């Protein structure tokens, strides 16, 4: 879900944030 962040953070912020 996210590159730098975890899957949970990827859904909230985005694939980069």
From Swiss-Prot:
Alphabetized UniProt keyword annotations: Amidation, Neuropeptide, Secreted
Keyword Cell membrane carried by entry: no
A GO MF term: neuropeptide hormone activity
Entry's Gene Ontology BP terms: neuropeptide signaling pathway
Cystines in this chain: none
Role this protein plays: Myoactive.
Name this polypeptide is given: Pyrokinin-5
Organism name: Gyna cf. cafforum (strain SR-2005)
């Amino acid at each position: 879900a996210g590159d730098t962040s975890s899957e949970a953070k990827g859904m909230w912020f985005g694939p980069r944030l």
